Design a protein with these regions (language model features):
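Positively charged, small/polar-rich N-terminal and surface patches that mediate targeting and assembly
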Residues: 1-96
């Protein structure tokens, strides 16, 4: 299993939620507000002063091939949108 993490600007939150909900290989996901920090981000003046940029994080657990397929589709549907992602191995998951 893999954990696909997507970082999006707040302006894309609703559009990305709608898109993720229409994907047949995604049975659920988690989203949360996060703050990005660092010099590698384009920040406006207020963000530069506060040292953070608001963003939305999406986390999706998928089989590797499904995750790779979702990434291809994201690149096609959201080209140039400044989404950032990473794919990490997930050693264990479940419910308690």
């Amino acid at each position: 299993m893999m954990l696909l993490t997507i970082i999006a600007p707040p302006s894309m939150e609703e559009e990305l939620i709608d898109w993720l909900l229409t994907q047949p290989n995604i049975t659920g996901f988690t989203s949360q507000t996060a703050n990005g920090h660092g010099s590698g981000h384009e920040m406006n003046i207020a963000e530069q002063v506060s040292g953070r940029r608001r963003q939305i994080t999406f986390m999706i657990v998928l089989q590797k091939l499904m995750a790779e397929s979702i990434i291809v589709d994201l690149k096609h549907c959201f080209s140039g949108s400044r989404l950032h992602y990473w794919l990490s191995p997930l050693t264990e998951h479940g419910s308690i």
